[in-house]
Structures are given as structure tokens and as C-alpha cells.
């Protein structure tokens, strides 16, 4: 569970805020205290419009996968995956604030994992059971019904386009 602590100060926060502004998202807060973390923390940013807040975590400026579930209160419950469960993706937090994004889309009531290369629809049952694996996702570019989502993302955040 996230523990509220004093906010990080310094160059990392400045770079995160710069990236957030670049992508048109609102920087909410960055905590320095998170269960299971050393020299790490949690970032919460907000995308205006129909997209809910998303949260991702970092350790020593590396973005890490987490286990998660969407709660009735509208919050994401996050917890670190063990090394054996981790999905093998890490990216510099500073270089791309949107590299891993967990999004609940109000339009279609679906969950998506976004990064700079592709968009994955997440299996809600797996989220509810807090067991997530790439095998439980669907490459969104293969689903015709998601064109509206792609257009929205490409127009607002330039995440789709030729990167898929």
C-alpha cells in the first residue's frame, strides 16, 4: 500500500514535471515512501478528460512493473512483483514518463496498459485476482473496436501512430 510521505525534491522531480507538461498531463505528486521500496517511490499523474488517474512506480529512476487491481473506490491497489514475476520491462523514468501506464477507460470500461510501443487491453478478471501476465493481454492494434481509443491517444499524446 502507498504510504504518504514527504515529496521528493530535486532534479528527478523537475524532469518528471517537465515530461508531464510535455505530454499534457498534470503532475499530481511524487512520494518517497512506498512499501517494499528503497530509494524509490510512486508517481501519480492525471490525464484530463475521460481518462482516470494513473500511477506508476520507480526504483532508482527505473520504472518497474507492479501488481495491481482496480478497487470500488476508484483507486489502484499497487504492490511490487517479485523478481521472478516481473515481466522483463524496465525503462528510464526520466526519458519517458508514459512508458508504462495503467489506464481505466471510461468510454469502454476497459483497462489498458500503455507504453511507447503498443497498447494492451488487460483482462479484467486477471486484474481482479491480482494475477497479471502479458499472456493475459491483447495487442490492441489487432482489435478494430479500439480505433477511437487509438485516435484519441495519437491526437493527444502521440503514443500510437507508427509506433505500433
Model-based region annotation:
Residues 114-135:
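Short, electropositive alpha-helical surface patch
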Residues 45-57:
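Basic/aromatic recognition patch in beta-strand/loop cores that engages polyanionic ligands
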Residues 71-91:
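Mg2+/Mn2+-dependent nuclease catalytic core
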Residues 1-45:
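Acidic-basic catalytic patches of nuclease active cores, encompassing PD-(D/E)XK
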Residues 90-121:
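Nucleic-acid nuclease catalytic cores
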Residues 28-30, 65-68, 102:
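Short, conserved beta-strand edge motifs with alternating hydrophobic and charged residues
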Residues 1, 132-164:
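Charged phosphate-binding loop/patch that engages nucleotide di/tri-phosphates or the phosphate backbone
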Residues 54-56, 61-73:
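Conserved catalytic cores of phosphodiester-cleaving nucleases, focusing on short active-site segments
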Amino acid at each position: 500500500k502507498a504510504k504518504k510521505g514527504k515529496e521528493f525534491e530535486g532534479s528527478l522531480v523537475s524532469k518528471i514535471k517537465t515530461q508531464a507538461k510535455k505530454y499534457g498531463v498534470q503532475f499530481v505528486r511524487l512520494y518517497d515512501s512506498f512499501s517494499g521500496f528503497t530509494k524509490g517511490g510512486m508517481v501519480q499523474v492525471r490525464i484530463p478528460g475521460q481518462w482516470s488517474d494513473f500511477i506508476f512506480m520507480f526504483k532508482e529512476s527505473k520504472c518497474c512493473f507492479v501488481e495491481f487491481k482496480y478497487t470500488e473506490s476508484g483507486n489502484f491497489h499497487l504492490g511490487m512483483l517479485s523478481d521472478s514475476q516481473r515481466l522483463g520491462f524496465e525503462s528510464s523514468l526520466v526519458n519517458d514518463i508514459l512508458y508504462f501506464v495503467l489506464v481505466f477507460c471510461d468510454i469502454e470500461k476497459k483497462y489498458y496498459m500503455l507504453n511507447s510501443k503498443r497498447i494492451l487491453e488487460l483482462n479484467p478478471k486477471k486484474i481482479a485476482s491480482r494475477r497479471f501476465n502479458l499472456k493475459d493481454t491483447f495487442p490492441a492494434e489487432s482489435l478494430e473496436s479500439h480505433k477511437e481509443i487509438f485516435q484519441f491517444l495519437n491526437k493527444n499524446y502521440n503514443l500510437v501512430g507508427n509506433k505500433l
